[in-house]
Structure formats: structure tokens, C-alpha cells
Amino acid sequence: MDKSVRLRDNREYNVVYKRGKTYYNRNFSLVVYNSKKGTRIGFSVTKKYGNAVERNRIKRKLREIVRLNFSEFDKGLDMVIIPKKNTEDLTYKQLESALLHVCRKASNKKCQK
């Protein structure tokens, strides 16, 4: 993933958390905020998920899913993807379909707040 499509500062994450709208499914929470800077995506994996190895593994998988399916994401949105604990048992294909499901759910609502 290119650095221009990542949320990087703590400040940017805070804006998305405070002003964004949250969408859920069984495996992910997705916080979405309308942005004027183009589509940017960040990942947040809590310590409840497991040790650093497990947290980094899920982030690597999610980054790859986003990279390969970037055209599926709505333009002009800042998004924070938060995987839930039960995602550690899913295969790559199941992760991909679950993430795209919650993204479609968010884009159907037009992510307005």
C-alpha cells in the first residue's frame, strides 16, 4: 500500500474516530469519515487480539487485501479497519469476503454523518 493512502498520524485516527460512522459485521468494525484528501485507510488491532506477532500478521493480511481490492473502496473516505478476535481463525479468502462485505455495507449507506 502506498503511503499516500494510509492514515499515519494519531491525529488523523482521532478525527476518524470522533467524527466518523461505524459499521459492523461479525468479523470487523469499520469506522468511516468523509474526507477531502482522497481515500485513506488505517488499521487498528487491539492488544486483546494477541501478541505482537499475531497482531502484525493480521495487519499484513489486511493490507494485502486492501491493496488488491482498492478499487472496491469508495473514493474520498478515511477508514479505520478494526478486526475482531475471531478473525484469527479465518482463511485469507474468508477474511477478504468479510472485509469487502462490511465495506459494501458502508458504501450502501453513503457513509454520511
Swiss-Prot record:
According to UniProt, the reaction catalysed is:
Endonucleolytic cleavage of RNA, removing 5'-extranucleotides from tRNA precursor
Q: Which UniProt keywords apply?
A: Endonuclease, Hydrolase, Nuclease, RNA-binding, tRNA processing
Q: Give the EC number(s) listed in the UniProt record.
A: 3.1.26.5
Establish whether keyword RNA-binding is in the entry: yes
Q: What is this protein called?
A: Ribonuclease P protein component
Q: What is the protein's known function?
A: RNaseP catalyzes the removal of the 5'-leader sequence from pre-tRNA to produce the mature 5'-terminus. It can also cleave other RNA substrates such as 4.5S RNA. The protein component plays an auxiliary but essential role in vivo by binding to the 5'-leader sequence and broadening the substrate specificity of the ribozyme.
The cross-references to SUPFAM superfamilies, in alphabetical order and at most eight, read: Ribosomal protein S5 domain 2-like (SSF54211)
**Classification via InterPro entries:** Ribosomal_Su5_D2-typ_SF, Ribsml_uS5_D2-typ_fold_subgr, RNase_P, RNase_P_CS
Query: What enzyme class is recorded for this protein?
Result: hydrolase
Which Pfam families did the record assign? Ribonuclease_P
Gene3D superfamilies linked? 3.30.230.10
Instruction: Please state which protein family the record places this protein in.
Output: Belongs to the RnpA family.
Q: Which gene encodes it?
A: rnpA
One Gene Ontology cellular component: ribonuclease P complex
Q: Name one GO biological process term.
A: tRNA 5'-leader removal
Subunit structure, briefly? Consists of a catalytic RNA component (M1 or rnpB) and a protein subunit.
TM segments? none
- Single GO MF annotation: tRNA binding
